[in-house]
Amino acid sequence: SSFLDRVREESLAYAQKVGSDLQENVYRAMKILAEGFFAEPSNLLSHSEEDIRSVQDNSMRLLYRLLFIFYAESRKLLDTDNRRYREMSLKKLKEEIAEKLDQGEAPLAVRSTYWEGLRDLFRLINDGSEAFGYSREEFYIPAYDGRLFDPEKNPFLSSKRIGNSYLAEAIDLLARSDGERGKAYVDYSSLDIRHLGSIYEGILEYRLHRAEESMAAVREKGKEVWLPEKEAGSRKVTDRAEAGRLYLVTDKGERKATGSFYTPEYIVKYI
């Protein structure tokens, strides 16, 4: 095969790997965001069914927002080379978080400065740069015309908070994956919109539950399924949720969504 064919095959293989790594990390990030919303006392959330659903839906939306911004920044739709934008960017935040975590510094759960910064970024994307008083010469972002960033359509995300430790861990899971030489930044520009779409679709399959008793995820017929830990027997346990902790499960009782790659462009309704 020609050199170009080989490059194409390699980049496709890389995108597939990024996609599958990301699916596992997205799963973990969603659980951490949910835990973060519950852990913040000022959010006044109980573990009622209603609050669990609300946290599930909004952790999902927050994930969509973060994935959207990672993708848009990687494609320079949001220009991280612009000094004004860079100060507010997710790129700057992910680098700051990575540096802290690599130095063994744990961000504090009681502070929510990362969240405040993100909320400004969400507002910038929703309202556009001119609403912030920037001239077109300084930099320009048109107002985003969808529901995803609209504060009125997402009152939970406009009023609740999440502590730095939870947000840092979730953002780092989305920003970096474990490579052969340690952690490396995920190249979102290698994903096409369908890859991102299949990850979005996978997220939609998740339901947040609170474990009534200790739960274990075990491999069964090539899939990971959740069951009470006492029923796990000698099977290899891949994940656990202690009683009272949150865990994510699909409608089929599986631990992880199977979001197939190369699904049609249904994602367009989000973006």
Mark where each language-model region is.
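Preference for the N-terminal adenyl/adenosyl cofactor-binding alpha/beta module
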Residues: S1-Y270
